[in-house]
Amino acid sequence: MSGSALFICPQGNNVLSADLEWCVPTLANARRAKSLKPTGLKLLRSPDLTRIPWLVHAFTTRPGGFTTSYGRRTLNVGFTKDDLRASVERNRKQVLLATGAVTRGTQWPLVTLRQVHSDIIHVVRSRKPDKLVGDGVVTDLPRLALGILTADCFPVLLVDTKKKAVGAFHAGWRGTVKRIVEKGVGIMRLEFGSRPEDIHAAIGPGIQKCSFEVGEEVEDAFHTQFDYADELFHNVQESDAVRERYPMLFMNQRAPGHGDPCIKLHLDLREANRRQLLAAGMPEANITALADCTVCQPRRFFSHRAERGKTGRQMALVGIQ
């Protein structure tokens, strides 16, 4: 059971195919666990990171879990107020099994954060860290899974192929303005001796520029930080779209086509994070990004914006075997 997703390598505008994988790699493990049965979950993997033999990584999607508050059999991995905690824990266990984050039948510890849209990054040196507050986490410990939760914000995974170190980052617009992924590369250089040319990045599913309408305060914030900010914002004309869909609402108004066009300001948050990675010294060829939009595909992804805040969470997971 597989489909395909598009990962973009910005160099030369190449488009790479990334498999949507059912939990076949550890199907036997799932069958042995009485509380778990394979449910058709689908995981996204970067084709670039997949070539690293000692790496475990995945971006989860919406279908194929045990939670039910946001649809039948969904893979919500966030502890929201609507889904049962036990069901979310079963989903997380299923993801660890499916990605191979298990050694001799024992699941790896999963490190997550209480995310606060910050630039706080933690270096994990223990398999049982204290409760962490922030939006980035890095480690060089093997058999430890790092997880970032998202539902429109971009998850970014960093992997140093030489030093065997990994990082996971939550990049919403606020964290992006604070340069969280650029700082993540810096932390890996300081803590592990990483070189930017040895680091590979995968930007996971998030809200693409087609859907990310923002206000002037967001534009102003980016302009205070980045000299290329103009290249990240786009004016989108939305003229008469509602009239065309609901013509009866405008029986006594001006005919379609005669009103002033509605200009909306949209932000390319994915590109903003890609530019930060380049600014940190990473080669363009080492950066891949998922092209799919979480807002445009609510059946495939949880989306805070599309579902007006009442939704689950995806997880971006990375670890060292």
Describe the residue ranges of each PLM region:
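Active-site microenvironment for binding and transforming phosphate-containing groups
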Residues: 2-321
